[in-house]
Amino acid sequence: MSLASVTPSTLITWFQAQAACSNARKRLPTNAEWQAAVAGTPDPGSDDGTTDCNTTFQSGQDPTPTGSRASCVSAQGAFDMVGNLQEWVADWLPRSDSVSGTWSAGVSPTGDLQYLGGAATTGEPGALLRGGSFLLGALAGPLAINGYNVTPSAVGFGIGFRCAR
């Protein structure tokens, strides 16, 4: 369940997100937990990003307070799992010397994965960003991994996190 009317934090590294969750006696969700929590959230392809979920960048637009898009809620009651901000999850992917290809609907220990591109490091383990942001439009889908092998010290206006118990 998410809290409504919270302004999400941005420009957060994976390490800062992990520390913030720990300070709240919580933790970052695993990729599999995130995948279960997103079920039932509208796909950004269902509208132009202005009514369902905050997925369409418009000049002057920022991430919206949680729950401000009434229809952007998952079956589990989590707000804004698609759009608003990309979210760090606990899982890292192993070292990779190249990033290429597409994964879709593949069952793995870390959940169903779909690679859509994103900033990547080469040759180092990387953290995962899930869900897309208001900056990504239709790429902000429920199965999107918008960063594969992203350095965990990366920050961005469209990067945030959520905590789990």
PLM feature segments, named:
Residues L85-R165:
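Surface-exposed recognition segments
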Residues M1-F79:
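Short aromatic-cysteine micro-motif
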